[in-house]
């Protein structure tokens, strides 16, 4: 049975009594954002709205975007990436679980030197896919042209953000390329691999 979104107590400034709010709203107040699903227009708009609000609230405090996503809509992912570059505060990106397709694209968009993968995280890159499987010839041609433009855009961003040559990124995007956290660091998608907290490990 689904339990819904957990709620936690939060005391507003100047108030004596705490109110119960969902855990994500509480974390947003600490500038912690989460992408824990497939990227679509709805989640993209939510993340962009939160980033714009936090940017206006305080431009001096960094934001932290935790990513566990299989990817999703290309334009929605690009819009999140662009918003990350637009806001004044640095956006740390932290990969936990999987950052695939547009998830990895958003991951690499974090502030350089502030992109992190947890030790057992996985990253995957590939080229954008077409949404037309059955359509008129003209529609398919137009779609193919648009996909090529998007692929070129994504490739250039990966080149800029990873430091890899254009030919390497272009070749790797021809197929699904999975990486461990350490491999993603060597590739340039992340800058650091988090260290396990051994104090929490019990014998």
Curated annotation (Swiss-Prot):
Active-site residue numbers: 101 (nucleophile), 126
InterPro entries registered for this protein in UniProt: ClpP, ClpP/crotonase-like_dom_sf, ClpP/TepA, ClpP_His_AS, ClpP_Ser_AS
Record-listed E.C. numbers: 3.4.21.92
Any one Gene Ontology BP term: proteolysis
A GO CC annotation given for this chain: chloroplast stroma
Subcellular location: Plastid, Chloroplast stroma
A UniProt-annotated Pfam family: CLP_protease
Catalytic activity: Hydrolysis of proteins to small peptides in the presence of ATP and magnesium. alpha-casein is the usual test substrate. In the absence of ATP, only oligopeptides shorter than five residues are hydrolyzed (such as succinyl-Leu-Tyr-|-NHMec, and Leu-Tyr-Leu-|-Tyr-Trp, in which cleavage of the -Tyr-|-Leu- and -Tyr-|-Trp bonds also occurs)
Main location per the UniProt record: plastid
Function: Cleaves peptides in various proteins in a process that requires ATP hydrolysis. Has a chymotrypsin-like activity. Plays a major role in the degradation of misfolded proteins.
Description of how the protein assembles with itself and partners: Component of the chloroplastic Clp protease core complex.
Family, similarity comment: Belongs to the peptidase S14 family.
Protein name (record): ATP-dependent Clp protease proteolytic subunit
């Amino acid at each position: 049975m689904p339990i819904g979104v957990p709620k936690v107590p939060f005391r507003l400034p100047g108030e004596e009594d705490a109110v119960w709010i969902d855990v994500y709203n509480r974390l947003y107040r600490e500038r912690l954002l989460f992408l824990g699903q497939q990227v679509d227009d709805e989640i993209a708009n939510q993340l962009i709205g939160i980033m714009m609000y936090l940017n206006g609230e305080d431009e001096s405090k960094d934001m932290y975007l935790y990513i566990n996503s299989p990817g999703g809509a290309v334009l929605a992912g690009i819009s999140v990436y662009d918003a990350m570059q637009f806001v004044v505060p640095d956006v740390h990106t932290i990969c936990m679980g999987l950052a695939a397709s547009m998830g990895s694209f958003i991951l690499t968009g974090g502030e350089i030197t502030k992109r992190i993968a947890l030790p057992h995280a996985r990253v995957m890159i590939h080229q954008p896919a077409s949404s037309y499987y059955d359509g008129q010839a003209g529609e398919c041609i137009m779609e193919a042209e648009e996909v090529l433009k998007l692929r070129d855009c994504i490739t250039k961003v990966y080149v800029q953000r990873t430091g890899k040559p254009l030919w390497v990124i272009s070749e790797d995007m021809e197929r699904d390329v999975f990486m461990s956290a350490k491999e993603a660091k060597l590739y340039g998608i992340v800058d650091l691999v988090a260290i396990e907290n051994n104090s929490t490990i019990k014998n």
